[in-house]
Amino acid sequence: RWKVFKKIEKMGRNIRDGVIKAAPAIEVLGQAK
């Protein structure tokens, strides 16, 4: 039961890290238009 929770937690952290890394690129693309 705990392994599933840990897996979801890790996945959520990966998604959050991806959003944080992508945010500046999205801003640059938005300014370029």
Curated annotation (Swiss-Prot):
Q: Which UniProt keywords apply?
A: Antibiotic, Antimicrobial, Fungicide, Hydroxylation, Immunity, Innate immunity, Secreted
Instruction: Tell me what turns on expression of this protein.
Output: By bacterial infection.
Where in the cell does this protein reside? Secreted
Q: What is an example of a Pfam family matching this protein?
A: Cecropin
Checking InterPro entries in the record gives:
Cecropin
Biological process, per Gene Ontology: antibacterial humoral response; defense response to fungus; defense response to Gram-positive bacterium; innate immune response; killing of cells of another organism
Q: In which tissues is it expressed?
A: Hemolymph.
Instruction: Provide a GO CC annotation, any one.
Output: extracellular region
Indicate the principal place this protein occupies in or around the cell. Answer: secreted
Concerning PROSITE patterns, the annotation shows: CECROPIN
Assembly and interaction partners: Monomer.
Job of this protein: Cecropins have lytic and antibacterial activity against several Gram-positive and Gram-negative bacteria. Also has activity against fungi.
Q: What name does UniProt use for this protein?
A: Cecropin-C
Q: Which organism is it from?
A: Heliothis virescens
The root-end lineage is: Eukaryota, Metazoa, Ecdysozoa, Arthropoda, Hexapoda
